[in-house]
Amino acid sequence: RRQRQMCIRDSFLGVQSVYPNVAMEVMYTNSWFDIDKEGAAAEALIANGSVIIGQHADSTGAPAATQKQKDAGKICYSVGYNIDMLETAPTAALTSATNVWEVYYEYLFKSMMDGENPATNWSEGYNEGAVAITDLGPEVAEGTAEKVAEVEAALKDGSLHVFDTSKFTVNGETVTTAPIDLTFYDYSTGTPVAVYQGDTEEAITDGYFSESTLRSAPYFSLRIDGITEDADPVA
């Protein structure tokens, strides 16, 4: 769940930058790919009043369910993951977050051809073109493309930090310190087992939480205010 938790929080902060009073409800499927559970989660969230259904799982279950609910008269939209969801949700899809894998593969192959060992801890972003969003859907608000371009430019030049600590609170308080244990744990057995012993380092510098700079694996796990996580996974 750790990677998903980080993506939940940055999605929330992105929406909150436009709609300050937004609230987010989170349901877990405990799977990277389960069409039925993802669809059921989307339907349950929409029934609870959610208007935008985001996902950090790989199937088309959530976008398809969102489109079905929208066709039935609900006001609801989808933000997908990894691939363009417009074929699945032609009017409900707003966009998808996606990884641009050719950037990494080009780096990997070039390193090998040059006789160099590729980095084992690699994480890049907008500046290198390693992440992006897919085409915008037909029902995005007027001016969205221009705003997206503005935000992407700010991410690239470093003037915008997603995890600016002035933009969120934890239990009503501004966070000023966040020591991160960089030990790598294997959670596959249900009991965490340390497979690499790392140092503990401070993640907050210059007023923002510096995600994915101390290591490539996500480590932003602060439970920020405004997000409710359902305790039980989707059945």
Where are these regions (language model features)?
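Structural motif
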Residues: 30-44
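Short, small-residue-biased leader/transition segments that mark boundaries at the very start
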Residues: 3-8
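Extracytoplasmic/secreted envelope proteins and their assembly/folding machinery
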Residues: 12, 38-42, 59, 63, ...
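Short beta-strand elements in bilobed, periplasmic/extracellular small-molecule ligand-binding domains
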Residues: 19-32
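Periplasmic-binding protein-like
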Residues: 48-59, 77-81
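Segments of small-molecule ligand-sensing domains
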Residues: 115-235
